């Protein structure tokens, strides 16, 4: 279920402070964050955020198309190795 419009988007305060400081100083260093639940807002456009996926930090460069999505959507937590196929299919009988 989507968040109510009257509440506005959720962004962790510590992340928003880092974003505003980075914009103010025009610093190009990536911002490291564990806040996968925060919504991407227009203030973040052009920044690189390192989002934690549980094991490592995944760099996410924010563009206009990312606005409105959550940060966690761009840092997958699981790696899909594929289903085990039969040997006949792999050989190409």
UniProtKB/Swiss-Prot annotation:
GO terms for biological process: ribosomal small subunit assembly; translation. It comes from the Bacteria. Transmembrane segments: none annotated. It comes from Wolinella succinogenes (strain ATCC 29543 / DSM 1740 / CCUG 13145 / JCM 31913 / LMG 7466 / NCTC 11488 / FDC 602W) (Vibrio succinogenes). One of its GO terms (molecular function) is structural constituent of ribosome. GO terms for cellular component: cytoplasm; small ribosomal subunit. InterPro entries: Ribosomal_uS19, Ribosomal_uS19_bac-type, Ribosomal_uS19_CS, Ribosomal_uS19_SF. Keywords: Ribonucleoprotein, Ribosomal protein, RNA-binding, rRNA-binding. Belongs to the universal ribosomal protein uS19 family. This is Small ribosomal subunit protein uS19. Protein S19 forms a complex with S13 that binds strongly to the 16S ribosomal RNA.
């Amino acid at each position: 279920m989507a968040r109510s419009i009257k509440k506005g988007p959720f962004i962790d305060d510590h992340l928003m402070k880092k974003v505003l400081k980075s914009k103010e100083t025009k610093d190009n260093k990536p911002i490291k964050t564990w806040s996968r639940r925060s919504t991407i807002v227009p203030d973040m456009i052009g920044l690189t955020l390192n989002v934690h996926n549980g094991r490592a930090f995944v760099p996410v460069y924010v563009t206009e198309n990312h606005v409105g999505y959550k940060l966690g959507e761009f840092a997958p937590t699981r790696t899909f190795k594929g289903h085990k196929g039969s040997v006949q299919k792999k050989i190409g009988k």
